[in-house]
């Protein structure tokens, strides 16, 4: 009430000549929104665009021409030197006291070097590395005694490897039991059935014992070059690369890929992290199982 009385007592002086400021004419007073499709522009990427390397693009598209270019340059240089000696009237026999002869000999040496370089470039070509289709059959074998949580954990590991890497086959052996065999597997030539993992034979092999002894990840970047290939008969015949990841002291994960040197350093680190997680989960499960079996006995 007191506040109202105070406001009523305040008198604002009124002047008839007072001028009120008007907004500038160019100031937009109204903003209209239109929902018509013609006024909407398609959204495009407006950030920095990657620069194109024109030289690299030209070389990749004209590989044969670039490799044979030193031959053309060397041949043209050789013909130019011979034509110069013929036209200039210099004796065809090289004279050590003549500066022209010494320059021609140097030019001939460079021309021959270009010719040899071109021949080497044409004869030596890098082998293109492309993914292959594994020769085998799809397989999904999971240990029946595992609880649903463990099966979900193993399937998560498989999906993670399949999506993020070139993994096409996965075998996990822990505590002497093959917990899961999933992905592409070899096919038996006799009965056309899948080749199941034989844990006893695998654990007796030098590959398994070497990994468990070193307790470190083993990366076979080109599987065909390693004699231990015969110890992994359950993998497809054309498996290109294999990673052997130890799972603590009691297990191993065999990961097969379809590309030579297809597993990058980040893939190997990711596989190591998955291996540590699986080792912790499987270790707790088997410890609990042993305690339960002891109590029941």
UniProtKB/Swiss-Prot annotation:
One of its GO terms (cellular component) is chloroplast thylakoid membrane. The chain crosses the membrane at residues 71-91, 104-124. Disruption phenotype: Seedling lethal when grown on soil. On agar plates supplied with sucrose, seedlings grow very slowly with a chlorotic phenotype. Deficiency in the accumulation of the subunits of the cytochrome b6f complex and lack of covalent heme binding to cytochrome b6. Residues 92-103 are lumenal. Disulfide bonds: none annotated. Keywords: Chloroplast, Membrane, Plastid, Thylakoid, Transit peptide, Transmembrane, Transmembrane helix. InterPro entries: CCB2/CCB4, CCB4. The keyword Cell membrane does not apply. GO terms for biological process: cytochrome b6f complex assembly. It is found in: Plastid, Chloroplast thylakoid membrane. Residues 34-70, 125-297 are stromal. Residues 1-33 form a transit peptide. It is a multi-pass membrane protein. Required for the biogenesis and accumulation of native cytochrome b6 in the thylakoid membrane. Controls the conversion of apocytochrome b6 to holocytochrome b6. Required for covalent binding of the c-type heme to cytochrome b6. PANTHER family: PROTEIN COFACTOR ASSEMBLY OF COMPLEX C SUBUNIT B CCB4, CHLOROPLASTIC, PTHR34943. This is Protein COFACTOR ASSEMBLY OF COMPLEX C SUBUNIT B CCB4, chloroplastic. The lineage of its organism: Eukaryota, Viridiplantae, Streptophyta, Embryophyta, Tracheophyta. The gene is CCB4.
């Amino acid at each position: 009430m007191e506040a109202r009385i105070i406001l009523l007592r305040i008198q604002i002086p009124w002047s008839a000549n007072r001028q009120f400021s008007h907004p500038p004419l160019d100031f937009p007073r109204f903003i209209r929104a239109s929902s018509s499709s013609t006024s909407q522009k398609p959204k495009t990427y407006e950030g920095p665009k990657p620069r194109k390397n024109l030289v690299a693009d030209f070389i990749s598209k004209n590989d044969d021409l670039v490799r044979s270019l030193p031959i053309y340059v060397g041949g043209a240089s050789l013909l130019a030197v011979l034509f110069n000696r013929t036209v200039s009237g210099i004796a065809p026999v090289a004279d050590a006291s003549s500066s022209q002869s010494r320059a021609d000999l140097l030019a001939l040496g460079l021309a021959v070097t270009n010719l040899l370089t071109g021949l080497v470039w044409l004869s030596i070509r890098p082998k293109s590395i492309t993914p292959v289709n594994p020769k085998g059959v799809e397989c999904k074998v999971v240990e029946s005694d595992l609880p649903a949580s463990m099966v979900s954990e193993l399937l998560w590991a498989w999906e993670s490897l399949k999506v993020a890497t070139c993994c096409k086959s996965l075998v996990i052996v822990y505590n002497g039991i093959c917990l899961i065999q999933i992905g592409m597997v070899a096919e038996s030539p006799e009965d056309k059935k899948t080749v199941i993992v034989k844990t006893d034979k695998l654990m007796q092999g030098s590959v398994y014992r070497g990994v468990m002894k070193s307790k470190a990840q083993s990366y076979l970047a080109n599987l065909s070059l390693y004699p231990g290939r015969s110890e992994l008969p359950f993998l497809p015949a054309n498996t290109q690369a294999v990673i052997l990841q130890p799972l603590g002291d009691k297990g191993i994960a065999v990961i097969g890929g379809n590309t030579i040197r297809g597993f990058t350093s980040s893939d190997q680190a990711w596989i190591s992290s998955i291996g540590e997680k699986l080792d912790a989960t499987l270790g707790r499960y088997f410890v609990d199982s042993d305690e339960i079996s002891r109590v029941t006995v």
